[in-house]
């Protein structure tokens, strides 16, 4: 009798382990645009010497150069990570000879995955667009918007509404997408409440705007949006939405019940580097850090999810030159207002996280994710 019970228990344990291994894993790719080690370190010291990245199991380094330039832009680097090919700066979803290449998001869709994109830039910006667009000029937003309508992405969050419905060709892509089953919302509350499996959350007409406070730093107010004050209630405006929309999207993807791929971009870490603005940089990293915490909480509970956190490049050539641990204050200096060729870190947690240790080209991020999808 006891022997039979033990055998039955062993069978159940073996079955559960096998089921988990045979189930396709979820993929969460987080890109801190412009986020080098100094951006991370500055945020960490400003946050009582702590960051959610300390919970990750493995750390690697990625070489960010583009096909013909040591200093990449977000289009070339985004294409390398999304599609596994080096290309020229400003190019999305094409190899260096102009051939269309398939992204990891599209490959995941072919294998039955649900998909999502979230960005604190406009959703057609280079990093998110690298996962669905094939075009030779990253700033051709109106054509990229047309490609977005055909992407099949389940959920997307970001700015850029005007490229869909305020167009010279008079097309209303929002109406076209609505006719094809999409729902659109303009605030986090409606996004959280929606039951649609095809949902767009526009956070601004063009680029999202924020009103942030970094820890121990002063408030900074940014340029006003290009829409009237009476329209502000329809948009997120200056509120942070990355962590809240990520949590809501993970819940939505989980409820669908299929494996999923999601790319989450903290876009404005890069913008702060271009501005050489330490306060802005720290506040943007801290928002990204809060979002990492949300993602880790999901992955730890799910136990069948790979989380990869990396950057497309470093911006600003930032260096911490002085500071105090006692009051979490720091002082950065910048050597550039553009991108640099520094390697960037790759943090990994969860399913087959060990694949991402070491030093490698950024194209290997695609290859490693592909090996997980094709397991």
What is the predicted function of each stretch?
Residues 2-8:
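Sec-dependent signal peptide recognition
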Residues 9-18:
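Hydrophobic h-region of N-terminal signal peptides that target proteins for export
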Residues 20-167, 171-193, 197, 289, ...:
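N-terminal catalytic scaffold of extracellular/periplasmic and nuclease hydrolases
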Residues 75-77, 198-204, 256-268, 342:
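Short coil-to-beta-strand
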Residues 126-132, 207, 212-217, 222-225, ...:
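Active-site His/acidic residue clusters
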Residues 254-256, 300-303, 337-341:
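A structural signal for short secondary-structure junctions
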Residues 308-311:
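Active-site neighborhood of phospho(di)ester-bond hydrolases with catalytic His/Asp-centered motifs
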